Amino acid sequence: GRGDWIEALGMDVPETYDELHELLMAMKNQYGCTTAIYLDSAAVGNDNFLAAGYGAPCMLATNAKESYWMVQDGTVMDGITNEGYKEYLTMLHQWYEDGLISRDFANAPGAMDPSGMSEITSGNCGVFFNGAPMMSMYSAMSDDPNLRLIGLPDPVKTKGEKTHVDTTEYDFGVERMSISTKCSDPELAIQYCDFWFTDQGIQLANYGVEGLSCEVVDGKSQFTD
């Protein structure tokens, strides 16, 4: 989220849904952002950060199903049919009525899409959902020198509550690499895998080759096209 806005508003980092709602309203009123919280169609799926505080399904998987089975109080049930998910949707409806969510959220591109990125970097969005490593890329793409993004905790109904996020479906995560026993040079293969976690590898993966697909201006990477 926009840490610089939170500081300028004199507000604390939100921990509960009520605190987050109060912050979003303040961002909308103070900065005129039409998308105080950026949500796409995944907002009503189960791979988002908002649902978990209601005990509703939250599964960190890019190819998660629209619903999945869960066990609640010893009863097997479809995750999106529990009472918590209904509360979650009721809250989203209220936020939609308050003008905090884009009127066209069902057709909104993801936060990794160029259009979604522009919502975040242009000052039209206060809170969004994406991986922490993406914050540096959003900052580099923004023309706002004051933009400062910070991580926010998953909101809960009451302070002190814990959220439960399912990551057990995939033993090695959604994206993984493995080295076959047939590999002729496993040490070189490991070096290749490690490369993508270096500064040079991250730069190459996100912007491509400097001088070809991007240029570095004042310490910030910019696409040439």
Question: Model regions: which residues?
Answer:
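Extracytoplasmic/secretory soluble proteins
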Residues: G1-D225
